[in-house]
Amino acid sequence: MKTVEIYTDGACKKNPGPGGWGAILIYGKNEKEIYGGELDTTNNRMELMAAIEALRALKQGCKVELYTDSQYVRKGITEWMQNWIKKGWRTSGGDPVKNVDLWQALDKERNKHDISWRWVKGHSGHPLNERADELANLGVKEALGETG
């Protein structure tokens, strides 16, 4: 099974507003950068999209070290999701889970891989997290039609 490192980030100008996601996938000496954006979204949705699209980019099941600066994503996948599923995608308070469409997509993708979810402090100078942030901001620009 291949081992892949993934660094993800999401960005949003205003929240909600135009947003973008970015990810870097590293396998050995090979790197792949992906990004995208949406005109009307939230930062949390873009953080989720970064992880979903990065995992979708893998052509086969892999051992993955996925780094995110989003506690929402990391805690959601490692602590909260199991109970959400048991409760029919409801929170402990009985409310519908926010962004359930993306959580369900992430759940589907994560089941294809052996993933270790890692947290990295955002904007702390970590080079690969900073690159993921740059890609997310490119996604915002693309959504706004500002890329040339």
From Swiss-Prot:
Positions that bind Mg(2+) 1: D9, E47, D69
Any Pfam family the entry gives: RNase_H
Cofactor: Mg(2+)
Tagged with keyword Hydrolase: yes
Matching SUPFAM superfamilies: Ribonuclease H-like
Keywords: Cytoplasm, Endonuclease, Hydrolase, Magnesium, Metal-binding, Nuclease
Domain (RNase H type-1): residue spans on this chain: 1-141
Matches recorded under InterPro entries: RNase_H, RNaseH-like_sf, RNaseH_domain, RNaseH_sf, RNaseHI
Binding site for Mg(2+) 2: D9, D133
Cofactor: binding details: Binds 1 Mg(2+) ion per subunit. May bind a second metal ion at a regulatory site, or after substrate binding.
Coiled-coil parts of chain: none
The reaction(s) this protein catalyses: Endonucleolytic cleavage to 5'-phosphomonoester
GO biological process: DNA replication, removal of RNA primer
EC number annotated for this UniProt entry: 3.1.26.4
GO CC list: cytoplasm
Molecular-function GO terms, alphabetical: magnesium ion binding; nucleic acid binding; RNA-DNA hybrid ribonuclease activity
Keyword 4Fe-4S (UniProt): no
Subcellular location: Cytoplasm
Function description: Endonuclease that specifically degrades the RNA of RNA-DNA hybrids.
Subunit and interaction comment: Monomer.
UniProt xrefs under PANTHER family: RIBONUCLEASE H1
Membership in a protein family: Belongs to the RNase H family.
Annotated protein name in UniProt: Ribonuclease H
Organism: Hahella chejuensis (strain KCTC 2396)
Name of the gene: rnhA
